[in-house]
Amino acid sequence: MHFARVVKSIHSVYSLPMCDTQIVVDTEKIRKAIELQLPIAITTYTLPRDMDIYIGQVAKTILDLIGQPHVKDYLTYCISELTTNAKKANTKRIYFREKGLDIFDPQDYKRGMKSFKEESLENINHYLKLQQQEGLYVKVTMQVLSHALVIEVINNCKMTPMEFKRVFDKRVRARRYSGLEEALAHILDNSEGAGLGLVIMMLMLKKLGLEEDVYRLVVEEDRTISRMVVPRNIEIQTQTTKLAASIADRIDDIPQLPSKLLEIQRAIENPDVQLSDIVALISQDVALVTDLLKLVNSARFGMNKRCLDISEAVKRVGLRGLQNLLYSVGAGRVLQSTDDERKQLWNQAYRTGYFALGLAKATGDQALIADSYICGLLHNLGEVVFTSAYPEMLIKLTEIQAERNIPPHVLDTIMSDVGHAEIGAALAQRWNLPEPVINTIRFHHNLPHAPEEYKPLISTVAFANMTIRFLDGETPYEQIPRSLLSFFRIQSEQQLRTTAQTLQSSFEAEQTA
């Protein structure tokens, strides 16, 4: 049997006619979401044919932009299969309710499934209308991370044990088949139309050379998630990291941190140094003294009496706080500019640092509080560097690409925020910045791959950045990962807006103090 006919036979019965108005894919918004590694979310209640096509077009656009067009047909089929199953699961809830059956009761489930397919198809518009009225949705999210494309299909119904078992059985059966023809000859399930489609999906993933564990089924109390984590080309990841390191090595016009600050840094790291020695070194740098006193007298320290003594100021901020101040001042001096774009980037960096500190304080975690500001401040170091060296850096990029025969889409990755993170991390290593700072720069767009010990810190900076984008109208609430909202106990859009506005007001007050 031809593959296209198989797909049509499975899906056409649950598709509504295409609407007259076609939904247009916004390529630039998708490109920006990829750069920021934000999830692209699409929600539908009835999954009409035009929406199914639109979801497929969004997926194809993403795959084109990340240089993997060869998997488009396979993955769009998988997404279509999972969304159809999710919609069908919602329909099933309405059908069972109308029949007075308990879908979680094994006997009722068996009884209802005998007639579900035929009767629901005869009156599908009725059931879809009720689904929408009751708020039963299908949500598709697609998120491009540095290592993978994460696709989730979510419906807000808890899967029953019987449904879970049937899906598991189909997965086990799919392992027995070497191809589609063999599967078609053995699997025909009249009650569960999703069975054959799931087997086809598993065989398609196998054909792509993927392990079956790229597909996961997650059952929560109020929703069911079908998740696919499709690896990006490993070679591309390696090339991106190497290219970023090469760029950092070739930035000749970016000097090391100022020698006086490095001298103070070495003194702090010396276990035999006296506090008076550190104070003496700081006293030789008027600008550093100014920044130190400004810091210790700022609202974040909450002191009732102003401090004007350098020795007392060092005691109050502590050696760790002093180190972070050195990195902040040093980076600012090296990369300072009157250029509007770079000034804007630094202003955004200061804002992110302040928001990260505010979020950290809410957790009460002292280690998190100590590192959050400096990591928030320097998280976009790569973007600042890239802007400062452009267009010279673009010339160097092109030279390196030609020398190493690197594909064009790897260069596109470097030009994106993801590439900026690699460049920033490489530069931070050149400056011998501490590991928390280096890891925050490298992974703030790639939380799943962040080292476990730094995840709370990196999550704080990433959430601070997203909170600012949300407040500025650049990132919708729906695009903020649920894991981050949960970590900071944000339960609604209004709660996030209130938090963001409070942090913004405090930030503005400190700027004018």
From Swiss-Prot:
PROSITE patterns named in the record: HDOD
Ranges where the HDOD domain occurs: 254-447
InterPro entries reported for this sequence: HDOD, RNase_Y/CdgJ
Name of the protein this chain belongs to: Uncharacterized protein TP_0073
Organism: Treponema pallidum (strain Nichols)
Lineage start: Bacteria, Pseudomonadati, Spirochaetota, Spirochaetia, Spirochaetales
